[in-house]
């Protein structure tokens, strides 16, 4: 890398998954620990160098190498700077002959020191929606029953939903999706957008050092 020290606010990388396959656009690493470590360790050290003190890094992978990557990330960024292991859950059936269907990717979220974080919200689940209906809604604001006479009382704040948890349900891109650009392992724009909104602000510098289909730049 030729970037100055501490010049990046957020790093997101959809890294090599260690499948050993040739995808045409690139040759993936083999799922061998020494090969994974030799490839990633020097790159992680450089990523830490360019990341600002309040910066964040997200690395996306699947279950083939996430256990090795967690060890490397702890070594480079520090166990105390681990923030979340996010599961991107999708429905994609395969012809697996043994074990449970594999339907999630792993996204490791670390900070360099004290990272910025913008809480993201999601809509209430159906049970909560039913409860909200019982409480009542007036002029778009959530209200609840008074204890004394049963009349409705407005709440002071708008209903934002609930804070986003660490299991993200989001479908893979379909072959006919409009945002498809012909890259086999392309990730949904909405997935990367969620990460950018959570850990960066307007005008921040976001880096993707495994820029496959270019989705991060969109």
Language model region names:
Residues 1-218:
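Core catalytic lobe of class I
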């Amino acid at each position: 890398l030729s970037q100055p020290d501490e010049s990046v606010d957020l790093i997101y990388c959809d890294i090599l998954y260690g499948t050993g396959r040739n995808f045409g656009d690139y040759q993936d690493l083999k799922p061998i620990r020494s090969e994974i470590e030799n490839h990633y360790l020097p790159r992680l050290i450089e990523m830490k160098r360019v990341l600002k003190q309040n910066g964040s890094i997200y690395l996306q992978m699947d279950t083939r190498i996430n256990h090795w990557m967690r060890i490397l990330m702890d070594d480079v960024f520090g166990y105390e700077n681990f923030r979340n292991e996010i599961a991107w859950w999708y429905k994609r059936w395969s012809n697996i002959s043994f074990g449970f269907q594999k339907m999630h990717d792993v996204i490791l979220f670390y900070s360099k020191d004290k990272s910025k974080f913008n809480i993201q919200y999601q809509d209430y689940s159906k049970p909560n929606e039913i409860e909200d209906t019982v409480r009542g809604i007036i002029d778009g604001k959530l209200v609840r029953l008074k204890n004394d006479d049963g009349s409705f009382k407005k709440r002071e704040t708008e209903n934002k939903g609930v804070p986003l948890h660490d299991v993200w349900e989001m479908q893979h891109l379909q072959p006919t999706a409009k945002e498809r650009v012909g890259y086999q392992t392309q990730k949904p724009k909405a997935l990367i957008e969620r990460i950018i909104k959570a850990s960066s602000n307007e005008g921040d510098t976001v880096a993707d050092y495994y820029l496959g289909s270019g989705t991060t730049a969109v």
